[in-house]
Amino acid sequence: MGVSPVAQLFHDSGEPKSALRIRPKYLTCSVSGVQVTPKPQMIIITRRILLTFLAALSTLFITILRADVQLPKVIDSHMVLQRDVPLPVWGWAEAGEEVTVKLDENQATAKTDDKGNWKVTLKPMKADGKAHQMTVSGKNKIVLKDILIGEVWVGSGQSNMEWRLSNTHGGKEAVATANHKEIRLFHVPKVQAKAPAKDVKAAWKVCASGPAAVFSAVLYHFGNRIHKELNVPIGLINSSWGGSPIEPWTTAESGSGGMYNAMIAPLQPFAIRGVIWYQGETNVLRKNGLTYYDKMKALIDGWRESWGEDTSFYFVQIAPWAGRYQAGQLPALWEAQSASMKIPGTGMAVITDLVDDIRDIHPRKKIPVGNRLALWALSKDYEKNDIVYSGPHYKSSKVEGNKIRISFNFAGGGLKSRDGKPLNEFQIAGEDGKFVAAEAAIDRNEVVVQSKEVTAPSQVRFGWHKVCNPNLMNAEGLPASPFQTKDWKGWTGD
């Protein structure tokens, strides 16, 4: 590796560490064409003088760098900007410096504060399929190219969101065909911080087989479906970390905040349409099932403080797994996730039917996961009103003698059995709460549940254990969510 002139000047020559010596060859100079060389003795520079010199040099270097206008990495060439909303653009420069941002004819100017921070907001723009150029001018000029206007989504969570496209069912074919000039990918590296960071080490990339192969499979399939349906550019930001609980993703006010600080905060207030979230396995292992609703609400509320109250937030109900979940914890989390749908602007994709290996916590069928999340966005954000975007969810129950009749939301074109066999995974109980396996039959858009062992039923539950494989779905092929008809205040049982 090369040595800089300053480093070479003070290169260690084997002299005592209390002093650094400059050899005469560095002091040879020319006066009126005559070479003048001091006597061959060494000139000693004390460590204190050296450190003072280097500190001054470092301060000068940092000042020079800070004087230049700078942008966060999320604002760069090849990015996608969210259409139809005001567009924040921000960065850093010398204190008091005037900075102008121009995107085509869209222009705004701001002056930095005493800490060198600046921010402008450009007017909303329409998606037009054209590549745009942005200039950011202060004492220097930054030119960003190949900018598209379209839809921007963030994907976050733990390993099932992080899971690479190349390592999924159909991954080889998906990677081979992942050349989409109008889809752009931004992958945030895994790091934590004690306070909100200003930037991340990442870059926007045009979607092609190489970058897509190592990108989030769920987020890619979600974005690809949106792109196909809307025919507008799509920007996808993946910020996920395998094995992470929900708490580090939550703002420091309501959680530990380490991942939020380093992997979400630097992206804000970059304009987005919404977030998709796939997480919860670690919190089940931590026996947080019953408290997960409060954690989820805190996370959504915290992120919306910066991105806006109308930011959509769609999430995946985690899959059944035969692993180390304690009895009742997975159904408890499912109940908390279902309750989270009461938060405005949210929706849940159910995937109980996508498990090939009940021993694998990572279902490899990611295409339908992304597609089911996309159904929520297409219906709620893009007004595709003819889409059935969810499988059946429990609505109400009615006791009819020794039977209980269950009504559902999102029955779509009607209820059916996925495999053509009698409905499974239904249990029934009386007031004693002792559940037994039950017979269940479809009656129009309702299900009637009964058992010869329970003559005075009061409650039903469905898919209520960690290795369930229920077959109830709607005509559109979307599975019913596990549920219980009675809200228990404590232990949910198994």
Regions found by a protein language model. Give the residues of each.
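Extreme N-terminal basic, low-complexity initiation segments
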Residues: 2-9
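Cationic, low-complexity basic patches in intrinsically disordered or flexible, solvent-exposed regions
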Residues: 9, 16-18, 26, 40
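Basic polycationic patches enriched in arginine
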Residues: 21-23, 47-48, 66
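Bacterial N-terminal signal peptides
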Residues: 51-61
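Cell-envelope and extracellular/periplasmic
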Residues: 67-494
